[in-house]
Amino acid sequence: ESLTRDHMHVYGYKRETTPFQTEANIDPHYTFFNHVYSCYTQTVQVLTCALTEKNQYNGMNLSDAYSIIDLAREAGFKTTWISNQSRFGIWDTPIGAIGSECDDQYWLNQYVGTDVITKDYDTALIPYLRKVDPANRRQLIVIHLMGSHISYWDRYPGEFYHWPVDTSKERETAEVMNDEYDNSVLFNDYVMESIMNEATNYLHADAVMYFSDHGEEVTARPGHNADQFNFTMVHIPFWIYMSEDYHRINPKTAAMIEARRNVPFSNDMLYDTLMGIMGLTAVHYDSACNLFSPDFDKDVTTLMTMYGNVMIRNDREQVGENKEEIDRLWNRKRME
């Protein structure tokens, strides 16, 4: 939630905000993707695409779109939804409707209203993974974090107050916001480490996919308002963990996942991409929107964000004139 890769050390940010993910980046079980964008700057608009057939490229109405939960259940998967976000808040109800399709649901946040509020840190979600039966190998588990959503200082416990290092200096508002956001990113990294410990040691997950809904502009007046759009609001992390078993059983898909680490992509196509990873390619699936399919037909000239109103090729710092140099630096860093 609200995590821009521009504040993640694993993606080149100056502060070490992601010690776990920085280490995971050199683990061959993980693949980090370098040029991934959100399709919008707000949660509902993003996740109603990322988790359903609807995307920027097919023009489908949400009311006509199947969700990944629909198709997983039809294919015999046990589905579980674990969330620290509100189920019925004004900003959350469409996502709550998707989560409510799951066989098992754990909604920690009972708040109903117009604010984004929770009484729990995201680590409160971790014990609910122990309610999942690891013996059932045909499962889809969705975890929805509160992440780095405003107010940043409410997203992490005191022991993760790492910045500023020198608390005696007076700070401008922009510096305070930057420090608080980075502390939330550091805590989020710890949450991901905790989730992955459960996923690998208890659930023995075949694969884990992690992405942010959208990014954040961190200034004196931070946020992700579409009316003040800039690209840092849609710069998001995306990575996949694959177990040894997944590599062995799905060698072609695993090889394609690793080969596509530097291919630009937008997260409204995660539905088709996840369908491909799960082997659900019979119906309600478009291989042209699956990043790991040979049929994937999007590139930097056609990729969009903001529901088709902004072309990703205009983000020249990331994928324009400097794309090849960025890729070289990224690959060199991985080998260090």
Stretches found by the model and what they are:
Residues 2, 75, 195-196, 206-214:
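Conserved beta-strand->loop/alpha-helix structural units within folded catalytic cores of enzymes
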Residues 2-168, 267, 272-297:
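Active-site-proximal alpha/beta segments of enzymes that process anionic O-linked groups
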Residues 12-17, 200, 204-205, 209-251, ...:
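Histidine-centered active-site microenvironments of extracellular/periplasmic hydrolases
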Residues 31-55, 207, 216-230, 237, ...:
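Membrane-proximal envelope and lipid/glycan-remodeling enzymes
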Residues 55-59, 113-116, 175-189, 196-197, ...:
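Active-site rim elements
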Residues 70, 87, 197-202, 226-229, ...:
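Membrane-interface soluble catalytic domains
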Residues 126-131, 166-208, 240-242, 261, ...:
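A long, amphipathic alpha-helix that forms part
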Residues 158-176, 246-255:
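Flexible internal linker/loop segments at domain or repeat junctions
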